[in-house]
């Protein structure tokens, strides 16, 4: 009886040991990817913040009517959702999806969705939410190529009045254990009250290259979202895998203890049987 129990525990120890090898390896890979993602995030953040300052000045000094500032009259809202292609990253994806669901549940008819990432597509399909476009297999270090494709699609949808507002839903990275889901409105732009006496004159008129400015800004914004999303994903996966490895270690300690106790019990029982047999033969 004890022998069967020992075999079962030995199998569990082998199984948990194999799982621990996988989680430890994935944790190490995620750590390396996170390090690279954080470097990329810092570079993109500087460019994005500088471009935001420039765009703010441009918007505040445009006096002509412009659909990118005044709106296009459409009541449709577009949500561009940034999720991951791979799983095993804790609550990273589900937190984003839950925020989207809470945001659109009051006005489903006027809410449209573009999803980035296999996991987001899978969740939305299960929930019966249709998508306008899907982008998958985004590289670990996203480039302007991916950002440009999405930016052009957004501009097309907005300029054709298919959507009247555009929101980006992504996870802002703060640390490996802290990320926050943000829903940022990017179109139409919002003018701010001029609080200084700054005067800017554009030559040629800024309206002549507004489309180019818009596309470059959207590319910078989307790239910033990509960078935050990748860092958040790898931070979540690293934390999840390290936690899984720690749990596996705890489980192995308990299994080793059970194995040793059972083996000790079996040895004690065998000794008792031998002693009992010897006594019976006297």
Swiss-Prot record:
Gene Ontology process terms (BP): proton motive force-driven plasma membrane ATP synthesis
GO cellular component: plasma membrane; proton-transporting ATP synthase complex
SUPFAM superfamilies per the UniProt record, alphabetical: ATP synthase (F1-ATPase), gamma subunit (SSF52943)
Superkingdom classification of source: Bacteria
The entry's keywords: ATP synthesis, Cell membrane, CF(1), Hydrogen ion transport, Ion transport, Membrane, Transport
Family from the record: Belongs to the ATPase gamma chain family.
Record-given protein name: ATP synthase gamma chain
Organism name: Clostridium botulinum (strain Langeland / NCTC 10281 / Type F)
Gene that this sequence comes from: atpG
